[in-house]
From Swiss-Prot:
Residues the record lists as Phosphoserine modifications: S469
Protein name per its UniProtKB record: Cysteine-rich receptor-like protein kinase 36
EC number: 2.7.11.1
SMART domains: S_TKc
PTM remark: Autophosphorylated.
Miscellaneous notes: Seedlings silencing CRK36 show increased sensitivity to abscisic acid (ABA) and salt stress during post-germinative growth.
Annotated localization: Cell membrane
Phosphotyrosine: residues carrying this PTM: Y413, Y513
Main function: Forms a complex with CRK45 that may negatively control abscisic acid (ABA) and osmotic stress signal transduction. Can phosphorylate CRK45 in vitro.
Glycosylated residue positions: N38, N64, N116, N150, N163
GO biological process: response to abscisic acid
Length: 658
């Protein structure tokens, strides 16, 4: 854990400054490490930061991106106004480019009272997404309290209010991208009004956010205990408090009244309305009340034990980020799915069936019941549980829990109401619902989900089975990558692996994976490229039996006959954007894995207002090997059986009725 003492940071020259002119309250911190000479870092930084303002709006208030060693993010406070957020991020970006020019790392928390906005812009030459960053600290204390104030009482009331605000801010609101945010307004005994705002970057876990904010409160109490307001900022979290309502964050928020002063002790406390207090009356009132209370407590305890036994238990083995894995009781799942009734069945996959369920709370769930002998063994089951409980991204399906009682192996996911992508893109009656903007958003979302898996999560994961049927669509048609049963976890210093058991869906698998069992992040990039071309054409890859969609699209590209690639439903849409996406798709399906782009580059190219140059694609992969033919027998590091090649044509997919 990083230390929070400001004076133990030898590598940083802290330039935390406060401007409070015309209602602008801004704190920025620059590092003292300069760029290495003759590098493109400054050019990439100057190209990346100006793009944050528009992209943070498109991403609903939080945006992170990287470009050739520059890692940046932008964040606005919850309930922001679009133009105010855009201006705030743009101003913060320009401030960092001018005030921290030449520095490898900096961050800037900015707020503007008149515009009702606050925001963060942060950049670094080190990958920090999803990681708690406590240093360097920016501390901006305000004016001192009135010396006649009761500082001890103020400190106690402040600590109590701050602790409650920390709990609110660090409790994740999964309905919002800006999930870590809290404000409070209270009247203290000796202070008419105290307003607090706390926020964390959404890439943190709830426990990391809580720790970061508590460190801010502790630091504030140690250094600013005699002030009427101030700001303590860190790269991962922000705490500001003041004696007035700032940045529009407290509109329609009721102020908590001051605690009542303790009444003076009266010597005649046993006398009321001229009558002597009768001790025996206590027995008359308290005895039956005590019996009723004891019965009530016993009932509550019995109910809680029964509920815990029948419904759920929390797995004691929490994952590394402190989030416990929810282990569902089989009885609860049977109740939720009406004992796996046919009416609740949503679909059938290669590894089992998927059912819709409803928890006692009313929450809808999707229950994947793995079939015996399906091929998804105990290791694969644990693999998916361990991976998904440690992954949190809006473009990944959320695992709610699991059950492994007796012979049952069950995974419980969030219910995603709009089925999977293949139910729309390959259905003539539904494909028109996928407008160009919806398709673009789906493609971007899948790309961001893959980038998170490959680079931005605490793990490095290769999905290995990306395809249209493994992309689920929520109520607003936002994509969520699903099905991690075949995913492989890499160490951070690993880039590729080999296997003798090639699993996946033929047509989406990269040629080096099909032929040699070699897989890497570029294998997922290939699958993404196939899916992207399917989104443009509205055709399944397998419809091009003799050569495959990538090869077909490549031929039409070099012949200049792009009309035969494009879905007729897209004829009235921006041709330059469609061609750009075809180009990106062809780059992703190139025969040579080394020439395929990273998902980081794909995200950069997908920016609609970007000015980046996209390379020209080379020849796409021609994977025409039929399923009945096995590739050449080659030496592989994981060879355990004689058959070097086995294909699961249909892998487990969360399907929903059409």
């Amino acid at each position: 854990m990083e230390r929070s003492n400001l004076f133990h940071i030898p590598c940083f020259l802290l330039l935390f400054l406060l401007f409070n002119i015309n209602g602008v309250h801004t704190t920025f911190v620059c590092g003292d490490e300069d760029f290495s000479p003759n590098t493109s870092y400054v050019e990439n930084l100057e190209s990346l930061l100006p793009s944050l303002a528009s992209n943070v709006i498109r991403e609903r208030g939080f945006y992170n991106v990287s470009l050739d060693g520059v890692y940046a993010l932008a964040l606005c406070r919850k309930h922001y106004e679009v133009q105010a957020c855009r201006r705030c991020v743009d101003r913060a970006s320009r401030t960092l480019l001018t005030q921290c020019r030449g520095k490898t790392e900096a961050y800037h928390w900015d707020s503007e009272n008149d515009a009702n906005v606050s925001c963060l812009v942060r950049y670094s030459n080190i990958h920090r997404f999803g990681k708690l960053k406590l240093e360097p600290i920016g501390n901006v204390p305000h004016s001192s309290l009135d010396p006649s104030s009761n500082l001890t009482r103020i400190s106690q009331e402040f600590a109590a209010r701050a602790n409650r605000t920390v709990e609110v801010a660090s409790t994740a609101d999964e309905s919002s991208v800006l999930k870590y945010y809290g404000v409070s307004s209270a009247e203290f005994t000796d202070t008419p009004e105290v307003n607090m705002l706390m926020q964390c970057t959404p890439d943190l876990s709830s426990s990391d956010c809580n720790h970061c904010l508590r460190e801010n409160v502790r630091y504030n109490q140690e250094h600013n205990w005699d002030r009427v307001g101030g700001t303590v900022a860190r790269p991962s979290c922000y705490f500001r408090w003041d004696d007035y309502r700032f940045a529009g964050a407290f509109d329609n928020l009721e102020r908590v009244p001051a605690p009542p002063r303790s009444p003076q002790t009266r010597q005649d406390y046993r006398v009321k309305k001229g009558r002597m207090f009768q001790p025996w009356s206590v027995v008359v009132v308290v005895f039956p009340t005590g019996i009723n209370l004891a019965v009530f407590v016993a009932f509550v305890l019995a109910y809680r034990r029964m509920r815990r036994r029948i419904y759920t238990e929390i797995n004691k083995n929490s994952d590394s980020d402190g989030q416990a894995t929810l282990r569902f009781d089989l009885g609860m799942i049977l109740i939720a799915t009406n004992e796996f009734s046919l009416e609740n069945k949503l679909g059938q996959g290669g590894f089992g069936s998927v059912y819709k369920g409803i928890l006692p709370s009313g929450q809808e769930i999707a229950v994947k019941r793995l079939a015996g002998g399906s091929g998804q063994g105990e290791l694969e089951f644990k693999n998916e549980v361990l991976l998904l409980t440690r992954l949190q991204h809006r473009n990944l399906v959320k695992l709610l829990g699991f059950c492994n009682e007796g012979n049952e192996e069950i995974l419980v996911y969030e219910h995603v109401p709009n089925s999977s992508l293949d139910h729309f893109i390959f259905d003539e009656d539904k494909r028109w619902l996928l407008t160009w903007d919806v398709r673009y958003r789906i493609i971007e979302g899948v790309a961001r989900g893959l980038l998170y898996l490959h680079e931005d999560s605490q793990l490095r994961i290769i999905h290995r089975d990306l395809k249209a049927s493994n992309i689920l669509l929520d109520a607003e048609m936002n994509p969520k990558v699903a099905d991690f049963g075949m995913a492989r976890l890499f160490n951070m210093d690993e880039t590729r692996g080999e296997t003798s058991r090639v699993v996946g869906t033929y047509g989406y698998m990269a040629p080096e994976y099909v032929r040699h069992g070699q897989f890497s992040a570029k294998s997922d990039v290939y699958s993404f490229g196939v899916m992207l071309l399917e989104m443009i054409s509205g055709e399944k890859n397998k419809n091009f039996e003799t050569e495959g969609l990538p090869a077909f699209a490549w031929k039409r590209w070099i012949e200049g006959e792009l009309e035969s690639i494009i879905d007729p439903y897209l004829n009235e849409n921006p041709r330059n954007e469609i061609i750009k996406l075809i180009q990106i798709g062809l780059l992703c399906v190139q025969e040579n894995a080394a020439k395929r782009p990273t998902m980081n580059s794909v995200i950069t190219w997908l920016a609609r207002d970007g000015t980046f140059t996209i390379p020209k694609p080379t020849e796409a992969a021609f994977v025409t090997l039929p399923l009945s033919v096995k590739p050449e027998n080659r030496s592989m590091s994981e060879r355990k059986d004689k058959d070097p090649f086995s294909v699961d044509e249909v892998s487990i997919t969360v399907l929903y009725p059409r």
